[in-house]
Amino acid sequence: ELSGGEKRRVAIAGVIAMQPRVLILDEPTAGLDPQGRDRLLERIQTYQRDHHTTVLLVSHSMEDIARVAQKALVMNKGQIVMFDEIARVFSRAEELERIGLSVPAVTRICMRLREKGLYTGENAYTVEQAAAYLLPHLKRRDGHA
């Protein structure tokens, strides 16, 4: 018997085996543990890059969107309310929150640090970006540059 996550991965693999030009995935990481989510998103990115495929990812997980998407289309009550590059969409955090979405947690951290005057750099949308932006800043503050 396959677990829910295994069934999801098998279904996605079956669709990918057909080598579609456009791959539409609806909440592909729902129910997956963090490692399974990371592996699946990496495979989706690799497939997209290697096969020059358009991937439409439907998700409530802004962390997933930040990690794999170049653009985001945000809908509310069946209407398109935003369609832009990830950085521009996530820069509208208050609007996203009003419709029940949020920016990635790491982006909220950057915003809060900026509000408190502790950070002046760019917002990060992934943990990897945050590490690249914040670690040098923190080292300078501690005098360990």
Named regions from a protein language model:
Residues 59-60:
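H-loop/switch region of ABC-family ATPase nucleotide-binding domains
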